[in-house]
Amino acid sequence: YETFLQPTDDESVYPYLTYNNVLVWRAMKALAHLYPEQYGTLEQQAEAVRRAIYAHCVFRDAEQKPYFGWSVDLKGQHNVYDEPPGSLQLLPYYGFCAPDDEIWGNTVAMIRAPSYAYSFADAPIAEIGCAHAPYPWILSLCNSLLCGYKEQAFRELEQMEMDNGIACESVDPVLGTCTTGAAFATCAGFLCHSMKQASKEVSHAD
């Protein structure tokens, strides 16, 4: 499925976004489950979308390790990128792949690596930004809470002032103070949800 907008509402480089198509897959699965009489056939269509993602959105790096491209043109072109409002890090959370999936693991390693343009891996707030706001995003911290980096994310939360304690779009990578998007209400809601989900995992582990 084609789109010209990324999760930030910025225009995409190529027309087919991996993350957006995963959302299409998830929505079709949900509709088929909730309304089987009306939309049961969407289960087959969802599987077709899933197969298409693996067929067209997976590439290999210089070491031949597979990873998910961010956007593709179906002609072999793609870009390596991620956006905190709709991150490839959330694929296991949506049930698209397992947390130990090799392709997903390689993808996450690439976008969290110090060499990635919008990674702040070496900073106290070691989250990810994007072109829309090139600082660590609070939504990236939410993604960390949901994708296996909850210990790091909780530590970062303790260091952040944000917008006087209110969730904002992005923060300074060292100070944790608001840099863009003060009083970001939808971000605050997702942060609460992510913290709750991560806390459940901690309590179950105990």
Give a label for each model feature.
Residues 78-98, 134-206:
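C-terminal capping/lid segments that line or modulate ligand- or cofactor-binding pockets
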